[in-house]
Each structure stands twice: as C-alpha cells, then as structure tokens.
Amino acid sequence: MVEILKKPVTGRSVWQRAQVEDASQWTYVLDEGMRAEILEAAERINEQGLTVWDLDRKAVPLERAGKLVAQCVEQLEHGFGLAMLRGVPTEGLTVAESQVVMGVVGLHLGTAVAQNGHGDRVVSIRDYGKGRLNSKTIRGYQTNESLPWHSDAPDIAALLCLTQAKHGGEFHVASAMHIYNTLLQEAPELLGLYYAGVFFDYRGEEPPGEPPAYRNAIFGYHNGQLSCRYFLRNFADSGTAKLGFEQPEVEKLALDTFEEIASRPENHVSMRLEPGDMQLVDDNVTVHRRGAYSDEEDGSTDSSRHLLRLWINVENGRQFPTSLSTHRWGMKAAAKPTH
C-alpha cells in the first residue's frame, strides 16, 4: 500500500527564493591548483588510451579538488539540493577532451548512468536541428526551445557550460519539497494522483517488448524521506496519446497545479551559466526549467550554446519506491535508438 506523507517536509531542502538568492551559499570555486589536478588526471586518461567510465575515483585521485566536489555532494544531499562548481577547466579543449574532464569530476560525484537508448553517459545539450518537443522522438536536450519544469531520472543532474548563447537559456530551480508543502495547504485532494503517477513517453527509446510509454510517480515517501520525480510535461502529454487514450482532466489539473506553484516568482531562483560553470541539482528534492535560447547570428557550430550533461547516482544514496525510479539507474538499450 502506498504511504502518503500528510505533514509538511522540514529541513534545508525546503526553501524559497529569498533563502537561496545569495549564491555564495551554494557556489564552490576551483582554484588554479585544483584545476591543474583535474587537467592532469584527464590528460593521463587520454595518454593511456583509457575510457574514464572504466575507472573509479580511487584510480583517478583528486587530492584537493576531490574535497571540494565532496562539499558539493554534501550540499546536494543534505542542503538546498543545488550547487555550482565554478572554474571547471574547459578553455581551449575540444568537446571530447571536455567530456573527459567532466568525467573526472563525475567520478568524484558518484556513478554516471546511461541517459539514452544508446547508453551515452555524457550527452551534448545543444540545438541538434532535428525538430522540437512536439516531435514524437525529440528529447529536451536536443532542442533550443524552452523546457518546462522537470527533474531528471538519477540523483544528480550535472550541466557543464562550454559555450553560452547570446540570448536566453536561463536556468531556474525550485524546491520540490516546498512545492509539496504548498500542495498540502492548497490542494491536498490531489496528493493521491502524484503518488499514483502518470504515463510518460519513451520518445522512441523504449526497450524491446515494452510499450511506448511508462508510468512514473511524481512523489514517493519511503524510510522517512519524501522524494520527487517530475518529468517533462510534453512527455506526459504525448505518452497517453501513444497509448491510445486521453489524459484525464484531473491529471492535467494536478500537473498544472504543480507547475503553477513552481512558477511563482518567490518560489524559484534563476541563474545563467557561463563557460566553466557546472550546475548541479539534486533531482530528489528540486525541479528545474530552462528558457529558450538563440545562437550566434552566423549559425557557426563553434559559437553555438553547448553544454554537457551527466546523470549521477551518489554513493549510498537514498532509497525510494520503485514507482518513482524508472530510469534512476540509467536508461535501458532501446529496441531502435533514435538519437
């Protein structure tokens, strides 16, 4: 039987904008020595022809930088659920070299998991020019349009900025725990729907023999902890359509209500990433959205907005119901990968 939390969540993961607006509380800056550690580790991996994902943090020690990354994890898991690691060395590196740098940092965050049906553990967030979210196969990281409130599948989503667009692309984060407390006050009759979950579209990346959409809960309560997973609304809209039925109006109301609370100006903090910034969010306790962005007028690839993303599970992370964790441990190989 599903256990529904009927009292407010407490702790640092419950916040509004005024409490986190001072970014120095959750910003961690790599100094030159730390940057050198990371670069040297990445260079060793490249020189030896190794794949960073075949290694673990013991094989890639970061004496000083590793301690700062550990502080980020502490902030994510036991603090506000967001952190900024500033000064990640990417200047002058190729995209492939930057992926290794991100992988080195990722090893000290936790375990990277697959983000698509190809099994990619690092994906490029940029405009692929393949279409928009109303397409049946496009994922959010492949388009430059705005992305509504959502969380990703693992414990931590890490975004490393390589180049930024001239216009737009702002990043907004809200506390899912504060949203829950507001729902308790304003719409308690909807709570059961969030625990039951809705259907989300695989976007053509369903494993062999599985339907094109899957049910995932939005909130789950387990071992005294509330956790959240709120995937893209576009995927909920197209998921039910692919299964051959229309989404019930009460489910639409529940999703509308969740997003309206997150969108209140006092309930979220906004930021813009610059090259070398790694934004970290804890998907268990936060949701985020992205503004639309436009690239350089000349359209050259080198000047286009380009971020790298990792999905990370932390060591000894929290446990929660399987209804909430469809892709927590990574996406399975797709029958027909589309990306």
Swiss-Prot record:
Record-level Gene Ontology MF annotations: metal ion binding; monooxygenase activity
First-tier enzyme category under EC: oxidoreductase
Cofactor note: Binds 1 Fe(2+) ion per subunit.
List of residues binding Fe(2+): 150, 152, 288
Gene Ontology terms: biological process: antibiotic biosynthetic process
Pfam families listed in its UniProt record: TauD
Needed co-factor(s): Fe(2+)
Gene3D superfamilies in alphabetical order: Clavaminate synthase-like
Domain of life of the native organism: Bacteria
Reaction catalysed by this enzyme: 3-(N-acetyl-N-hydroxy)aminopropylphosphonate + 2-oxoglutarate + O2 = (R)-(3-(acetylhydroxyamino)-2-hydroxypropyl)phosphonate + succinate + CO2
InterPro entries the record matches: AlphaKG_dependent_hydroxylases (IPR050411), TauD-like_sf (IPR042098), TauD/TfdA-like (IPR003819)
Record text on subunit structure and interactions: Homodimer.
Family in the record: Belongs to the TfdA dioxygenase family.
Domain notes: Has a jellyroll core motif at the center and helical bundle motifs at the periphery and an unusual lid structure which consists of two beta-strands with a long loop between them. An access tunnel is found at the back of the active site which connects the putative binding site of 2-oxoglutarate to the solvent outside.
Job description of the protein: Monooxygenase involved in the biosynthesis of the phosphonate antibiotic FR-33289, an antimalarial agent. Catalyzes the oxidative decarboxylation of the antibiotic FR-900098 (3-(N-acetyl-N-hydroxy)aminopropylphosphonate) to form FR-33289 ((R)-(3-(acetylhydroxyamino)-2-hydroxypropyl)phosphonate).
The name this protein goes by in its record: FR-33289 synthase
Species the sequence originates in: Streptomyces rubellomurinus (strain ATCC 31215)
